[in-house]
Amino acid sequence: MQDPIQGRADGSSPVSVHFVNNVLAAAASYIEEEPDTARDVLAELGAFLSHRLRGPRVVSAAEELEHVGVYLRLEQARFPGRLEVELPASRDLPQARIHPGDVQAPLSQAIERWLRQQPGRVRVALRAREDGLDLQLDRPDEPGEAGERLRIPLALEAAGSTT
């Protein structure tokens, strides 16, 4: 069995150490002025790590979207006031089973790219489609700027399959 902290056989890691360090730093920054926020951030980080470090398996698209919501709340704690988030209701998701991280990984890459490009807010909207999700990123403060669209397919296994 692989060690989830050390990573996978292909050299990838289920969790970015850089991300975890940044979330812990964000939580530390809230301790004195906003202790409830600090506790919430640490609880969300615990949920995030629990989901990502459980090992190889598949989950429902709804469970993965719930995990994506946790991830996005952690990013909002790291970048206060910079991320607006819109997620579809779980009932609108396709009935698919996917690997944990199949949605969060491309989403985190896109968010990181957009946050580093320039200061300002970034709106992140995921919309359910029959066979996946559409990710839309844009800057609400700059309506004329072209946004970015990314298609995230969700079709690993039929909903009735178990692994």
What annotation goes with each model-predicted range?
Residues M1-V15, F19-P153:
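Two-component histidine phosphotransfer core
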